[in-house]
Amino acid sequence: MTLDMDAVLSDFVRSTGAEPGLARDLLEGKNWDVNAALSDFEQLRQVHAGNLPPSFSEGSGGSRTPEKGFSDREPTRPPRPILQRQDDIVQEKRLSRGISHASSSIVSLARSHVSSNGGGGGSNEHPLEMPICAFQLPDLTVYNEDFRSFIERDLIEQSMLVALEQAGRLNWWVSVDPTSQRLLPLATTGDGNCLLHAASLGMWGFHDRDLMLRKALYALMEKGVEKEALKRRWRWQQTQQNKESGLVYTEDEWQKEWNELIKLASSEPRMHLGTNGANCGGVESSEEPVYESLEEFHVFVLAHVLRRPIVVVADTMLRDSGGEAFAPIPFGGIYLPLEVPASQCHRSPLVLAYDQAHFSALVSMEQKENTKEQAVIPLTDSEYKLLPLHFAVDPGKGWEWGKDDSDNVRLASVILSLEVKLHLLHSYMNVKWIPLSSDAQAPLAQPESPTASAGDEPRSTPESGDSDKESVGSSSTSNEGGRRKEKSKRDREKDKKRADSVANKLGSFGKTLGSKLKKNMGGLMHSKGSKPGGVGTGLGGSSGTETLEKKKKNSLKSWKGGKEEAAGDGPVSEKPPAESVGNGGSKYSQEVMQSLSILRTAMQGEGKFIFVGTLKMGHRHQYQEEMIQRYLSDAEERFLAEQKQKEAERKIMNGGIGGGPPPAKKPEPDAREEQPTGPPAESRAMAFSTGYPGDFTIPRPSGGGVHCQEPRRQLAGGPCVGGLPPYATFPRQCPPGRPYPHQDSIPSLEPGSHSKDGLHRGALLPPPYRVADSYSNGYREPPEPDGWAGGLRGLPPTQTKCKQPNCSFYGHPETNNFCSCCYREELRRREREPDGELLVHRF
C-alpha cells in the first residue's frame, strides 16, 4: 500500500508541478482519487490566480513579498516527509470533523500561502504571516435547533466547555457582565501537537497539519536571537520551583533539561501507534505520527513566535476521584512576548483552553449587526486575583547562578511587584475595566484543596519567582478589627456556596487515572512540586480606603472613556509617560496606578470592575468564508444522512419493542429530510434558517462509549498505556465502522435560556447537573442516543438512569429506558396484569 501511495504521489507531483505537501493534502482529501485531486488542483490554480487577496493578515505590520503562482513559486520549505500513514482511513481518523476537514483543498491553499510567506525563527522580521484578528465561528443562531446542535457537537469541545465552566474558570464573566460574549473551545486533534493545532485554529481556522508553527517554535528555541534570554527566564522560574521541592541541579543537569525542552519541540514524530488494545477502537493496519507533548515554557516561546500575548484558561489543580487536589496544573495564566518590543507585537491576545492535558482554541461566535456584545478575556480569576504572569523575570546576563539565588538583596531587585505586572499588561495588550452592576457577583472558582475556604490565600506557584504581597499594602490598624469580621462573614458565605462546588469536581477521570497519576507523579513532577494557586496577593488595604475609593470612581469615568478610544486595533505601544501628574510621583503611568488601585480594592472583597483584555474581531478573509461555506454544505449532507438513519432506527424500535407511537417531529426539518435529492448548496443552507429564537444551546457531553473515549495525557503524568511513557498523548480516534464519531454518543439538547431582548446571551450555559451525575471532566454516563428516549411526547431525553425509582443503574432505549433487571421485572409484572397501559401511566 505504501509503494502504491508513493507512486501516486510522485506521478501527481510530476504531472502538476505542485509541492509534495500540497499534493499529499489534495490526494488525502479525495481518498487518493487522482482524477478528483487533479480537478481540485485546477480549481485551486484558478482561485489562486484571481480571487484570494495577496495577504491573509490585513493590517499587520511588516512588508510582504507578493505571492507567486504555483508553477513558478520558489520552494521556501523542505518537501514534506513521507509519514508512516499508509492507510487512507488515517486521514479520516485524524480530522474526521471540523471546518478544515470539510474544505481540505481551500485549506491546503491557505496553508501553502501562509508557510510560503514564512521566515526564520528570529525576531528581526515577522517569522510567519500572522493575522491580527481571531477566528470566529459562524452565527449558528440562524439555523433550527436540530441542525444547530449537530454543528455544535461537531465543532465544539463540549466536555472541556462543561468542565471549565463548572470549575468557575471559563465564561464566569458572562454571568456578571451581560455585554460580554461567551467563548467556546474548538474541537482539536489530539496527536501530541494540540498546542500548535489550537493556536492555528484560533488564528486561521485550520489545524497545524504541516507543522508550520511547530517548526517555527523549534527554530526559535534552537537558534533564535532570543534564545539566551528565553533560557534565563526558564531557568529562573524552574529554580524557584525547585526550591519548593528542595531540588538542586548541577550545570550539566541544567543543560540536559534545556536540551530536552528543545528536543520536545521537534517536529519529528516521537512514535507511531499501530493497532493495539490500548487505543479506542484502533485503526487496522495503519500508523499515525504522535508528537512529543509540550510544556508551559513552549507556550511562552509560542507567544514570541506569534508576536502576540497568549492567555490560557485552565483549572489550577488536578483532582482524584475523592476530590483531593494532588497535582498542580501549571498552564493557566498569561504569556507575554517579553523579548519582543511591545510596539512590534499584536495587542489582541490568542486565547486557549487547557483541560485533561489537551489544548483547544477559545473563539467567539459571529454576531448580528445590532448586537452590542464584546469579546474579552479577563486577566483575573473570578476572585479578582491577577492571573499568573509566566516567565516574567529575566535576572540578566550578569546573574551568577547558585550564588545570587541565595542573596536576598539580589532577589529583591528582580522580583516583580504588582505595579510592574500591570505595567507589562498595559504595554502588551489593550486592557480596560468593565463596570459591574450592583447586584452582580462572579461565580466562585474551585478551591485549590477541598478543605480550603474561599477566603484562604492560596500559596503562590513561584512563576517568575515574584510576589505581590508587598505591593498590595499592609492592613490599616484602625480598620483591621472590622475588616476581620467582614472577611470572616464573607468566608462563611463563600464556604456555603462551595459545598456543592467541590463535589461537582469528582469525576470518572479521577477514578480511572487517579491512582496511576499518584504513582507516577513523584518522579515526573519533581521539578514542579510547587504549591497550588495563582499570584499571591495580600488582602490588606492601605489607610484612607474610603477617600481612595471616591477618587478612583471619579477618575475612572474619564479614564475609561479615553482608554476605550485609545485602545486601537493596531500594535501601538503603551509606554508610561515620565512623572505624570496625580500618580504620586510614580514612574508608571496614571492608567497603571488607577488599575492598581482598583485591583487592590477588588482583592479586598469590593470588586466593582473586571480587568479584561480586548479581543479583536474583524471581517473574515475570502478563504475563510469559502472554507466555512464548504463546511456548512458538508455538514448539511451529513446531518440529513444522520436524520434518515435515526428515523430508520426509530421505526425498528417501534416495530420491535414499541409500546407507543413514534416521537413527534417538527414539520420544518421533516419536509427537507424526506427529499431524495437535495437542492443546491446555497438554497439548502437557507433551508435550515428558521424563525427560532436566537438561543445557542450546548448539548450535554457524553463519554462516547467505553470503546471510543478520547484518551488524553494529564500533565506529563498520565497512565502508562501499552508500555508507553506516562506523558504520551494519544490521538483521538474512533472505530472506522462509524460514519460519524458523534452519531451514537451525543444526547439531545436541553432547552436554552433566553435573555430579555431575545438574543442568545447567556444561553450557552450548560444544562443543570446533579451532583451525583456530573464529573470534574465534564463527562456523564453514556446517555441514550439522540431522539430515542423521547417517549410518547417526542421530547429530548432528560435522564439517563433507569426509570424504576430508587434504581441506581442506567437504562437503554432497547429496554424502554429500564435497566436490564428492572426491565425483566416489568415484563413479568405486565404479564401478570391484564392492562399493559399501566406501564405508561405509572412511570
UniProtKB/Swiss-Prot annotation:
Region (Catalytic): 167-440
Source taxon at top rank: Eukaryota
Outcome after substituting H358A: Loss of deubiquitinating activity
Catalytic activity: Thiol-dependent hydrolysis of ester, thioester, amide, peptide and isopeptide bonds formed by the C-terminal Gly of ubiquitin (a 76-residue protein attached to proteins as an intracellular targeting signal)
Locations listed in the record: Cytoplasm; Nucleus
Gene induction: By TNF-alpha.
GO cellular component: cytoplasm; cytosol; nucleus
Gly residues: bias regions: 531-543
Enzyme class: hydrolase
Positions of the UniProt region annotated as TRAF-binding: 152-401
Modified residues (Phosphothreonine): T729
Ranges of biased composition (kind: Basic and acidic residues): 65-77, 456-471, 488-500, 665-675
Effect ascribed to mutating H358N: Loss of deubiquitinating activity
Record-listed Phosphoserine modification sites: S100, S464, S467, S471
Keywords, in A-Z order: Adaptive immunity, Cytoplasm, Hydrolase, Immunity, Metal-binding, Nucleus, Phosphoprotein, Protease, Thiol protease, Ubl conjugation pathway, Zinc, Zinc-finger
Family affiliation: Belongs to the peptidase C64 family.
Notes on the domains: The protein undergoes a significant conformation change upon binding to ubiquitinated substrates. The loop that precedes the active site is in an autoinhibitory conformation in the apoprotein. Ubiquitin binding leads to a conformation change; the loop is stabilized in a catalytically competent conformation with the result that the active site Cys can form the reaction state intermediate.
Protein name: OTU domain-containing protein 7B
Organism: Homo sapiens (Human)
Name of the gene: OTUD7B
